[in-house]
A protein has these predicted regions:
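Extreme N-terminal starter segment of soluble prokaryotic enzymes
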Residues: 1-4
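Glycine-rich phosphate-binding P-loop
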Residues: 6-21
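A generic local structural motif
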Residues: 14, 99-104, 121-124
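PAPS-dependent sulfotransferase catalytic domain
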Residues: 113-159
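PAPS-dependent sulfation machinery
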Residues: 30-115
């Protein structure tokens, strides 16, 4: 079984990567599905890796037995971008995400590829996680990343 972790700075393209990976056969990519605040209760990085492994195992079971996984989503789909095109009065874009079950209606083998992305949390733990998981960091031009942060209501850099 292949469990892949995606990391990178926020707004670097990790959500787009998940959306694209979900178009591949025998692959499911989840957008920030875990409660990363649970990581703080772990005694060390190895315990966090155990928590992630358990999450992956439970998610695989759920996908095979029930056809769904828990993930952030927009109207039941993992989007390519969580920032809305519309802007608010302040000129910043909003996000419309929910956290809950996402149906996966494609055939999955017993050894399908499961991808989990948590940019900030996995970046902080990359040294430990890369010893147990296949990890990929998404890199985007820093100016484009900062411009994206500046356009969002939930990333108030202007203050």
């Amino acid at each position: 079984m292949r469990n892949v972790l995606i990391t990178g700075t926020p707004r670097s393209g990790t959500t787009l990567i998940c959306s694209l990976l979900n178009k591949l056969p025998d692959t499911v990519a989840l957008h920030e599905p875990m409660n990363v605040w649970d990581f703080a209760e772990c005694r060390d990085g190895g315990a966090v890796a155990d928590l992630i492994e358990n999450f992956c195992a439970e998610t695989r079971t759920s996908l095979h037995e029930h056809g769904f996984a828990i993930s952030k989503h927009v109207r039941g789909k993992i989007p390519d971008n969580v920032a809305a095109d519309q802007v608010n009065r302040a000129g910043t874009r909003l996000r419309y995400t929910e956290h809950g079950p996402v149906s996966v209606d494609k055939p999955l083998s017993q050894n399908f590829t499961l991808v989990v992305k948590h940019p900030a949390a996995f970046s902080a733990l990359l040294e430990v996680l890369s010893q147990r998981f296949e990890c990929y960091a998404i890199i985007r031009n820093p100016l484009a990343t900062l411009a994206s942060w500046n356009s969002l209501a939930w990333f108030p850099l202007k203050d």
